[in-house]
Amino acid sequence: MPFTLPESKIAIDIDFDPDHLRQRFEADKQARERKDQLAQFQGLDDVLEVDDSDPFSEPITREPVTEELDALVLGGGFGGLTAGAYLTQNGVENFRLVEYGGDFGGTWYWNRYPGVQCDIESHIYMPLLEETGYVPSQRYADGSEIFEHAQRIGRHYGLYDRTYFQTRATHARWDEQIQRWEVTTDRGDRFVTRVLLRSNGALTKPQLPKVPGIGDFEGKIFHTSRWDYGYTGGSAAGDLAHLRDKRVAVVGTGATGVQVVPYLAQDAKELVVVQRTPSVVQPRNNRKTDPEWVASLTPGWQYERHDNFNGIISGHEVEGNLVDDGWTHLFPELTGQHLVDVPVGELPEGDQALVAELADMNLLMSAHARVDSIVTDPATADGLKPWFGYMCKRPCFNDEYLEAFNRPNVTLAASPAGIDGITSSGIVVAGTHYEVDCIIFATGFETGSGPAGIYGYDVIGREGHSMQEYFSEGARTFHGFFTHGFPNFVELGMSQTAYYVNFVYMLDRKARHAARLVRHLLDSGIGTFEPTAEAEADWVAEVRRSNEPREAYWGACTPGYYNGQGEVSKAVFRDVYNSSEIDFWNMIEAWWNSGRFEGLVFEPARDAVPVA
């Protein structure tokens, strides 16, 4: 249908009615809104009926330790691993890592469900490839290969000898007298460290919906991050032979559900897919890594690939498209430039916003068309179509998910209200009772309750100030790293740092920055570093300003973790700096090169004080 931009009067050819879509989006949002918002979920460890123990490693027995350190890293996922790697590269030797899991890997240690893969090309997702001499075997690596790479990094940099596994931090307190952090653990350990680096990860604490009757179910229940292969048989590659006589319900159709459904559909006697909100699912087009391409690689190839990918999704001019994936095609399309014959940036501001909205809708219609082209049952196809802005939820890329709904043993149980309840023999969705032997929750992780709530410990800074309280209205940092009143503390997560889609690239860059600062502290006789209150406030204001356009978008979205389940003030991305990653890291590099460390205050090291 022809559509005319109101200010510039430029005609656009689209095949959908924007007003109809807006109305449908609002109806979908209202159907899924809940008064309890984030409170609708509970931690896996709060549900006694569902096992939260580690199914992958035998318990480690050891005595408590007391150590004095230059640096302590909390977390052994890719954030902690890259921190350890760059500390080592910078000649820092007296450091340790503390990790809750039984090995390195973080989310890749815990998530070993069938079909688990990354949704970012593995050649730019997996860090330190050149440094460790490894090239992934396929475009989108399986979780097992990513986990093995985490182990490879640990071995390469000697981090196994520096790490305490199956250990949780329980408390961190700044001691002003000795200019050190004191950190205790659930093992009775006591670490006294000059610098504390936190990299506990965004996907740390599994969550379940608060469903009545969960304790009444007499069958098997588990979360995808605690996959029970003893019950299902098989491995992450599939062949779940023990399910061939089982009726299974999988709850959740986000990134995990989309990956695991094809494997359950292949092996379960019956599969019920419980869906509250459908996902956008576009082609993945995975393939093996070309040996000739590997042979052609020259030093610096991974960083060149990073820069090219980030340049495209940030809207920079780059030479070619090295990654050529769903993300690098998606972000240029979101600008809407392909819809008009003039540069979008030259349009009146109102028309620019409208073109972006139409581009978003156009992408969603392409996702609908893909559903219709694959799913043969019209009612099921309609149930699998999302009705919300394309970027309201992280889009998925998979080549087997939609096809699974053509199998006779697969049923879609869709309801905007989610699960009504669980009985002794099954699950109730939209008033229909489904008899099942096993319920698998693919319901993700806590993302919106704040760092202290997720990580299970508080950080106490100067004058007894609690970081949990200090962050009660959102993160407060300088450049996403440092917080006023919490000297020598470095946050390695995504809070208030530029980040689009490649989480591990962000972790890698933050770890490099942090390790340089630790080295500088050790070399310069510095006792403490800490941002000024003014520098922190200015950065928080800049982050808030950058997110104003996104907050308006998320406010119109169906509930999900991007928008805090409708509570936008607690949205996971509210505290991410909405800026080009290239521009952000160029700014950080310029900050270093100036030599002024603007925004930080350094205090000299005091005379050594014995640690009691």
UniProtKB/Swiss-Prot annotation:
SUPFAM superfamilies per UniProt: FAD/NAD(P)-binding domain (SSF51905)
Top-level EC class: oxidoreductase
Gene3D superfamilies assigned: FAD/NAD(P)-binding domain (3.50.50.60)
Species of provenance: Dietzia sp. (strain D5)
Site (Transition state stabilizer): R394
Official protein name in the record: Baeyer-Villiger monooxygenase 4
Disulphide bond pairs: none
Residue sites binding NADP(+) per the record: Q117, C118, D119, T253, G254, A255, T256, G257, V258, Q259, R276, T277, K393, R394
